[in-house]
Every structure is written in structure tokens, then in C-alpha cells.
Regions:
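Glycine-enriched alpha-helix->loop->beta-strand junction motifs that scaffold or abut catalytic
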Residues: 121, 173-182, 197-205, 226-232, ...
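Conserved anion-binding
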Residues: 129-133, 187-254
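Non-catalytic terminal accessory/regulatory regions of metabolic enzymes
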Residues: 1-97
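Alpha-helix-loop-beta-strand connector modules within alpha/beta enzyme cores
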Residues: 139-163, 197-204, 253-267, 313-336
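Hydrophobic faces of well-ordered beta-strands that scaffold small-molecule active sites
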Residues: 95-101, 125-127, 161-163, 180-184, ...
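N-terminal active-site wall of soluble small-molecule enzyme domains
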Residues: 132-182, 191-194
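Active-site mouth loops of central-metabolism enzymes
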Residues: 95-112, 136-140, 160-164, 185-186, ...
Length: 339
């Protein structure tokens, strides 16, 4: 149930009302917007009479919510959430570009790429230290050493880093490395124990949509994180599996406006994994801006032909420069601030 409070309702009476609701067993998601103050009740409200709620002098109106997600629901939180990643904002009109190699391969590689993408306008450095691969014989990443190299690149550029967490056992390593944003990959989108674990951390989370997951399933995974106390979740559309075989995945561009309607969380697009082919990345990136995304995640490699993973979808630094020159005017046209 959503309860909309009257403007300028006395704080002591609102507090007393909330205390009474708590005593009845309901959790309260308190959302204060620019024009509205909303209490989102979490729990079974079937027995809670609307007439009883409306009788309270601080209540303007109330309505029941049928969706299973509450904390992520835009009805509970009408204003856009803005997630801060190392001083760079995502959402609410702020647009962030995350770029870097699929895999961290060496100090020279990650530092060079970090400097190039930062110069072009990327505010957040992406790079894989632990790599989930389809084949057990493929390069699995430098692991702990990769985290160390990401830290060294951060010292050089000052960029916050985002990298993928694959299991709960690695959390201490990520905390020691002071990872600025934890990525939950598509294959782990419904690893509920992992979601609950990152929900207990004070670190922003980039949650990627699973290859065959519905939008509601994606939002419910975000709900797992938020239910544990971490509100800083960014959703990522990275392509879904369809019958089409000419590209790696199919970018569900319609996911962005629908997710914006369903939830208040920022939504970014990963055109690299969506296409799997480098020449398509700039066009999909432009489409992402036009459809209202809050950011991009793009793979850039100093020498894609020699990349240890996902070279076919990686841009060169020069190609990334050109992409950024293309989307900057587009961002300005749509009133987004590159942050």
C-alpha cells in the first residue's frame, strides 16, 4: 500500500502514525519528494482497511500496489534515484560512461586504456579481474592481481572502478581493494545469496539483466539488494537471447522506457555485449541516449585483435574517441549532463 501524506503535515503526528503502522507489523519505505511525501508499506496489507488509513488527519490519500517489488517501485518513490559512484552521478539527468577492457591483462594495458577513455569523457573505469567464461578453458582473468592493477590505474587517473563480483567468497578482496561499484553479471542476476550479500554492503551495485530474464525478474533481483539495506542499484540492459544469430545478443532498447516506468532506479545500456560486434556499438550507444538511458558501459581495448576476451566487440581508443564525440551533442540535445 502507498500512503500519500498531506503537505505540511506536522512531523510529530507523522511520526506517531508511522509508529502505529510499525506496531502493526509493517515496514515503511519513507520517500520525501519535491512535492510529495509518500509512505510505502511493505507487508501483507490485505487486512488494513483503507478507511482506517484515510481517517488519519495526516493522510491525503492511499492506494494498494499489486506489483511484488516495493522498494524499487516508482509508485513508492516517484523521483528518480541518483547513484553516486566515486563522485560521479548516474540518474536524475546525470549520464555516466563506464569504459575499459573486458579483462585486465597488464599494468601497462589497463593504465593506458584508463587514460585514453578518461580523456575522451568516460568517468568510470571498467575492467574484469574475475571473468565468468562459457568455456572452462578460456582466460578466467588475473583475479586478485587484476584488482591490484585496477587500483593502480585508479591512482593514476582518479577514476572510480567497477568490476564484476562472482561469488560471496571474493567480497573481502573487493572491500580491501575499495572497489567503487560492484557489478553483478548476467549469469548471477538470480544468485540470490550473492544479491543479499551485496545488499548488506555500502557500495553501489551495477545489476545486469540475465540473458533470458523478464524485466520484472530484473527488478525483483534489485529488490533483493534493496531489501537488505543498499538503495544504490543501477540496472543494466546488456542484450537478451533471441532467435537471431547474426549478432551475439539482441539489445532490448524498449527495456529502458519500461524500466523507467516501473522503477525509480537508473538504467544504463551495455551495447558491447548486446551486439558482440564492434562496428555496431556506436549506433547502439546513440540509440541508448535517444531512448533515455542514464549511462553506457563500453568495452575499449588498446589492441582488440590480441585481447584475451571479447576482442570482437571491443573498440580501439580512437574509435571510443569518435563515439564520445558523437554522443556528446546528443546528450546536450536531450538535456543530459555527462558526469
Amino acid at each position: 500500500m502507498i500512503i500519500v501524506l498531506k503537505q505540511h503535515a506536522p512531523a510529530d503526528k507523522v511520526q506517531a502514525f508511522c509508529k502505529e503502522l510499525n506496531s502493526m507489523g509493517y515496514q515503511i519505505n519513507d520517500s520525501v519528494g519535491s512535492d510529495t511525501h509518500i509512505l510505502g508499506l511493505i507487508g501483507d496489507t490485505k487486512a488494513l482497511a483503507e478507511s482506517w488509513v484515510l481517517a488519519n488527519p495526516v493522510v491525503e490519500t492511499c492506494r494498494r500496489v499489486s506489483e511484488p517489488y516495493k522498494k524499487a517501485n516508482r509508485k513508492f518513490h516517484p523521483d528518480d534515484t541518483v547513484v553516486d559512484v566515486g563522485g560521479h552521478k548516474i540518474g536524475g539527468g546525470y549520464f555516466a560512461v563506464m569504459s575499459g577492457p573486458c579483462s585486465v591483462e597488464s599494468k601497462e594495458q589497463i593504465t593506458y586504456v584508463a587514460q585514453r577513455v578518461q580523456a575522451a569523457g568516460a568517468s568510470i573505469l571498467r575492467g574484469g579481474a574475475f571473468k565468468p567464461r562459457t568455456s572452462p578453458y578460456s582466460f578466467q582473468g588475473l583475479r586478485a592481481e587484476g584488482l591490484e592493477l585496477l587500483q593502480e590505474a585508479r591512482k593514476v587517473t582518479g577514476q572510480p572502478i567497477v568490476t564484476e563480483l562472482m561469488n560471496n567468497e571474493h567480497i573481502p578482496l573487493f572491500l580491501d581493494a575499495k572497489v567503487d561499484m560492484i557489478q553483478i553479471g548476467a549469469r548471477n542476476m538470480q544468485n540470490f545469496e550473492l544479491l543479499k550479500a551485496v545488499g548488506k554492503l555500502n557500495v553501489p551495485v551495477l545489476l545486469k539483466r540475465g540473458l533470458s530474464s523478464t524485466l520484472e525478474e530484473l527488478v525483483m533481483s534489485a529488490e533483493y539488494i534493496m531489501a537488505e539495506g543498499n538503495p544504490n542499484v543501477v540496472l543494466c540492459e546488456r542484450g537478451i537471447r533471441t532467435f537471431e544469430t547474426s549478432m551475439r545478443n539482441t539489445l532490448d532498447i524498449s527495456a529502458v522506457p519500461m524500466l523507467k516506468k516501473m522503477t525509480h532506479l537508473p538504467v544504463v545500456i551495455d551495447p558491447s555485449h548486446a551486439a558482440g560486434i564492434a562496428f555496431m556499438v556506436p549506433a547502439l550507444a546513440q540509440a541508448a541516449v535517444a531512448v533515455g538511458a542514464d549511462g553506457l558501459m563500453i568495452e575499449t581495448h588498446n589492441d582488440p585483435a590480441k585481447a584475451k576476451s571479447d576482442g570482437a566487440q571491443s573498440l580501439t581508443p580512437d574509435q571510443f574517441d569518435d563515439l564520445m564525440k558523437t554522443i556528446k551533442p546528443e546528450l546536450e540535445f536531450f538535456g543530459k549532463t555527462l558526469n
